């Protein structure tokens, strides 16, 4: 089955502590989760690595978020949108359901 959300897609969080925030998808995990830039930040403890001259302490990084908690952002309408699939010139492409615009 083709993925409705892919890397580099612009998405909006629709539920949770980061509701309403927008970001780009950095990674899509096979477990039904995605990592989005600047969304769902968590603080991790990091040990110092003297060989690499890395200090220890707290590091903020993005944690995975369920794909059901995000929606694709349609720049043409300025809102979230649903995704459909269709064939154009023998290739399967994604499109926005509200205005039928093809997604890059």
UniProtKB/Swiss-Prot annotation:
This is Large ribosomal subunit protein uL24. Belongs to the universal ribosomal protein uL24 family. One of its GO terms (cellular component) is ribosome. The gene is rplX. It comes from Buchnera aphidicola subsp. Acyrthosiphon kondoi. GO terms for molecular function: rRNA binding; structural constituent of ribosome. It comes from the Bacteria. CDD domains: KOW_RPL26. Keywords: Ribonucleoprotein, Ribosomal protein, RNA-binding, rRNA-binding. GO terms for biological process: translation. One of two assembly initiator proteins, it binds directly to the 5'-end of the 23S rRNA, where it nucleates assembly of the 50S subunit. One of the proteins that surrounds the polypeptide exit tunnel on the outside of the subunit. Disulfide bonds: none annotated. The keyword Metal-binding does not apply. The keyword Ubl conjugation does not apply. It holds the Pfam family ribosomal_L24.
């Amino acid at each position: 089955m083709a993925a409705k959300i892919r890397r580099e897609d612009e998405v909006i969080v629709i539920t949770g502590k980061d509701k309403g925030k927008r970001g780009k998808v950095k990674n899509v995990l096979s477990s039904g989760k995605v990592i989005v830039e600047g969304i769902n930040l968590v603080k991790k403890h990091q040990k110092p690595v003297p060989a690499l001259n890395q200090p220890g302490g707290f590091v903020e990084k993005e944690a995975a978020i369920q794909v059901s908690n995000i929606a694709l952002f349609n720049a043409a309408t300025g809102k979230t949108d649903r995704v459909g699939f269709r064939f154009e010139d023998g290739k399967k492409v994604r499109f926005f359901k509200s205005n039928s615009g093809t997604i890059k």
